[in-house]
């Protein structure tokens, strides 16, 4: 068998998934900041959804906004963790990253926080 390999120019566009770990951090920093932040081009995932859910539980206002890249999500976040006295339940789903990142943040709320999850 003879095989002939001929060089050919290569081209195209490749959309590489964003780092989920950096996405968590971006959302958390925006939630901690006073005022409005726009976090763009985060790869959609259940873990990111869990982080948004818990940050909302802590008082951040998070709105999904249209993204220009397919498979990505952008968020408009009105930051500021709200202190209170009412106990809250933070559902981390199956996201270990959400749990690890947000346990310390729960202390800032001044509330009793119960963390829940599913899966492994």
Mark where each language-model region is:
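Short, structured segments at the rim of ligand-binding sites
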Residues: 1-120
